[in-house]
From Swiss-Prot:
Transmembrane segments: none annotated. Its EC number is 2.5.1.6. ATP binds at residues 16, 174-176, 241-242, 250, 256-257, 273, 277. It comes from the Bacteria. This is S-adenosylmethionine synthase. Its cofactor is Mg(2+); K(+). It comes from Limosilactobacillus fermentum (strain NBRC 3956 / LMG 18251). Pathway: Amino-acid biosynthesis; S-adenosyl-L-methionine biosynthesis; S-adenosyl-L-methionine from L-methionine: step 1/1. Catalyzes the formation of S-adenosylmethionine (AdoMet) from methionine and ATP. The overall synthetic reaction is composed of two sequential steps, AdoMet formation and the subsequent tripolyphosphate hydrolysis which occurs prior to release of AdoMet from the enzyme. K(+) binds at residue 44.
Length: 395
């Protein structure tokens, strides 16, 4: 019989260097999509002390003031003061963007299926790269997400609100959280075992003050009291000091927080990051579609926990494989579920773009606090509008 076990997930704040990079990349993507919904975008960002570097490939008819977008994004996050070692008005911004490779474009613009004479318009777009993507859902939270990750994200959102509203005046933008949850033998979360939270702060505040404020105004405000007990361990700023942070403390890079962005380590990951990529890149769009499928199958009652994998060949519209793992919790066979998925969901890139309406500027809001399980923003892949259709097929 399975025994109780612990599982840990982490999140980082919007002021974390890697997340600054993600938000800049997605802010540029949104600015381009606003003017040109067909823009092909693959934008990477790196940030370090006093410098933001934007590089990658773009094909578009739109003009966007990239420098302005970068600076505004940095300031919105909260880097507005030179003493942070990085601020939106005074940092250097270097832009080095090229056009998308014509070799890639020919396979994306006209898929293998179109080149072989098929006429379905949704076959038009070939996958922007090969790769494998995963979607996951679990019924352990109302968001259909793992509890340790949901709590970690909520801690980070809470501390950002307290900072931006100046409730706790000494807070600076960089922060990280990690939550360990204890599960019973049936896999049900029963308590929070450990909370780790590190936050950047002004130099003139005591560690005792930070620990008291964070415990009362952040942790206890976010984590339901029934999960906390006298055995719960708290590590708040355990190094003792966190004044130097953000890009001054560590260089940041787009796509380096892919587990924070997805399922907190509770599911597989195909390795492809999301931010800065338009929806012809299946790293992003197929991961969103896979989450949409997994969430609707779990919500429909066909599994308590489910993971789906899809895989693509570059320049080919149809996925090369679809597989499902219901971890022994399924009420239907995995083969039956895959057959239903093929009927209900179109997993060709153009089909995903149409199904989820992905040629819109909706991406910057996903670039911090997770792409999945969000209740604070309206995301099409979080909708449960396929439950009835799945029930009609699967019974």
């Amino acid at each position: 019989m399975k025994e109780r076990h612990l599982f840990t997930s982490e999140s980082v704040s919007e002021g974390h260097p890697d997340k600054i990079a993600d938000q800049i990349s997605d802010a540029i993507l949104d600015a381009l999509l606003e003017k040109d919904p067909d823009a092909r975008v693959a934008v990477e960002t790196s940030v370090t002390t006093g410098l933001a570097l934007v590089f990658g490939e773009i094909s578009t008819s739109a003009y966007v003031d990239i420098q302005h977008v970068v600076r505004e994004t940095i300031k919105e996050i909260g880097y507005t003061d030179g003493k942070y070692g990085f601020d939106g008005d005074n940092c250097a911004v270097i832009v080095a963007l090229d056009e998308q490779s014509k070799d890639i474009a020919q396979g994306v613009d006209d898929s293998l299926e179109i080149r072989e004479g098929q006429v379905d318009p949704l076959d038009q777009i070939g996958a922007g790269d090969q790769g494998l993507m995963f979607g996951f859902a679990t019924d352990e939270t109302p968001e259909y997400m793992p509890l340790p990750l949901i709590l970690s994200h909520k801690l980070m959102r809470r501390i950002a609100i307290l900072r931006k509203d100046k409730v706790i005046k000494y807070l600076r933008p960089d922060a990280k959280a990690e939550v360990t949850v204890e599960y019973d033998a049936d896999g049900k979360p029963v308590r929070v075992d450990t909370v780790v939270l590190s936050t950047q702060h002004d130099p003139d505040v005591s560690l005792e003050q930070i620990q008291a404020d964070v415990k009362e105004q952040v942790i206890k405000a976010v984590i339901p009291a029934e999960y906390l007990d006298d055995q719960t361990k708290y590590f708040i700023n355990p190094t003792g000091r966190f004044v130097i942070g953000g890009p001054q403390g560590d260089a940041g890079l787009t796509g380096r927080k892919i587990i924070v962005d997805t399922y907190g380590g509770a599911a597989h990951h195909g390795g492809g990051a999301f931010s800065g990529k338009d929806a012809t890149k299946v790293d992003r769009s197929a991961s969103y579609a896979a989450r949409y499928i997994a969430k609707n199958l779990v919500a429909a009652g066909y599994a308590k926990k489910l993971e789906i994998q899809v895989a693509y060949a570059i320049g080919v519209a149809k996925p090369v494989s679809i597989s499902i793992d219901n971890f022994g919790t399924g009420t239907k066979s995995e083969e039956e579920m895959i057959a239903a998925v093929r009927q209900v969901f179109d997993l060709r890139p153009a089909g995903i773009i149409k199904m989820l309406d992905l040629q819109r500027p909706i991406y910057k809001q996903t670039a911090a606090y997770g792409h999945f399980g969000r209740t604070d923003i309206d995301l099409p892949w979080e909708k449960l509008d396929k439950v009835a259709e799945l029930k009609k097929i699967l019974g």
